[in-house]
């Protein structure tokens, strides 16, 4: 199975900060990767698909990039509403696998 190693598991940042999190695939090429945002009690929301394509309606402060088997989600100019857990999903190789998640908190 392809393992998706996500880091950090949690982070705290201030409003207006630039935040990054990464997922690294343990193996494979041509990995198709999505990023999701999940808030407590809510269904996951697709942010980015194909590693870097922004889903319709998602603010442009979210962006995704890829270098080989390393994938990065960046949030620029952090806002209060961005407090959530973020996770990646690879859906190129069965079984599809998720990263462990990154819990993002806002420093007060």
UniProtKB/Swiss-Prot annotation:
Disulphide-bonded residues: 23-88
Residue ranges of the region described as Complementarity-determining-2: 50-56
SUPFAM superfamilies per the UniProt record, alphabetical: Immunoglobulin
Chain spans, region Complementarity-determining-1: 24-34
InterPro entries: Ig-like_dom (IPR007110), Ig-like_dom_sf (IPR036179), Ig-like_fold (IPR013783), Ig_sub (IPR003599), Ig_V-set (IPR013106), IgV_Light_Chain (IPR050150)
Region (Framework-3) location: 57-88
Region of interest (Framework-2), residue spans: 35-49
One Pfam family cited in the UniProt record for this chain: V-set
Domain of life: Eukaryota
Region (Framework-4): 98-108
Residue ranges, annotated region (Complementarity-determining-3): 89-97
Positions of region (Framework-1): 1-23
An example Gene Ontology biological process: adaptive immune response
Keywords on record: Adaptive immunity, Disulfide bond, Immunity, Immunoglobulin
GO cellular component assignments: immunoglobulin complex
Miscellaneous section: This chain was isolated from myeloma proteins that bind beta(2-1)-fructofuranosyl moieties (inulin).
Protein name listed in UniProt: Immunoglobulin kappa variable 11-125
Natural source organism: Mus musculus
Gene assigned in the entry: Igkv11-125
């Amino acid at each position: 199975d392809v393992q998706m190693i996500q880091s950090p598991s949690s982070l705290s940042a201030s409003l207006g900060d630039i935040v990054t999190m990464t997922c690294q695939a343990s193996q494979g090429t041509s990995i198709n990767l999505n990023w999701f945002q999940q808030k407590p009690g809510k269904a996951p929301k697709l942010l980015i698909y194909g590693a870097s394509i922004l889903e319709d309606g998602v603010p442009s402060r979210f962006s995704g990039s890829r270098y080989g088997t390393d994938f990065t989600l960046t949030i620029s100019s952090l806002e209060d509403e961005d407090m959530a857990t973020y996770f990646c999903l690879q859906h190129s190789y069965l079984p599809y696998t998720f990263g462990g998640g990154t819990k993002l908190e806002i420093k007060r």
